[in-house]
Amino acid sequence: MNRMVSHRSVWIFFALTLLLSWAIWIPTQLLVPENKQLPLQLLGGFGPFLAAIIVIGVKEGKSALRQWLRQTFHLRLNLIWYLAAGIFLPFGIALLHHLLYLLAGGKSAFTFDQTWGIYLAELVSTALVGGGNEEPGWRGFATPRLVAKFHPIVASCIVGIFWVIWHIPLYFGSWVGKDQPLLWFFIYASGLSIILTWLYFRSSQSVMPVMLLHAGTNIVFDFFPRTNVIFSSADLDFNVFKAIAYWIVALIIMVATKGKLGCRDAYPDSTSDSYGGA
């Protein structure tokens, strides 16, 4: 891969992602009643994936696009990666979040009143249309191209920043903004971006486990309480603890991988220059 072309393509990807998704989301927030917005909000969520397809198809050709699709969606992974992504990591992070809540003086109100069948059905549907479908763009396209230029942690944070910016129109609708302060979303999304980058490289650059983890983190917190123990707002408490939990896990990964987030396995011939000298 030509590094200069790759580096330029990723900025085109970010711009196109915003254009495609916002072209749906902004008119939706302005013109569509709240109770009818969800289908269009979900449709806009395919912006990163579609932008990646367009950029690769136009700048690298159909052959490169087919190769990228095969690599991005390959399934031949050890079962442990699917279990870790869909169950162990989401529930581990959520339980850490709950522990922090208890240490701060909250009362345990953890419930899991759904069957595992319902959880798994929600996990798959959310991976396909409710958040996980973003990952072919964010992690499958943008992350490896940024890592060709920047340190893996820097690359993860760049993706995290655009990830948050991309969500901004949803803060004016019924889906995100009412229970998720933008500042704390930025903080925990940056930590989650590092975790997702690590999982992407450790799973041989397949986005399938990454889609499951993204989906799992979207739904698992539905089983945990929102009671204020520090701030006046239960939602603020919830998101503060959520951000801390994500960053604890992200820091553990950063220390364990010496900041490489597993990408040295994917680019064994890379040098420090590949990361912009970091």
Regions of interest found by a model, annotated:
Residues 10-22, 45-49, 82-93, 158-160, ...:
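Alpha-helical transmembrane segments
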Residues 133-160, 174, 201-206:
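Membrane-interface helix/loop boundary segments of multi-pass membrane proteins
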Residues 109-124, 174-187:
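Juxtamembrane helix-entry segments on the extracytoplasmic side of multipass membrane proteins
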Residues 186-195:
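Hydrophobic alpha-helical segments embedded in the membrane of multi-pass proteins
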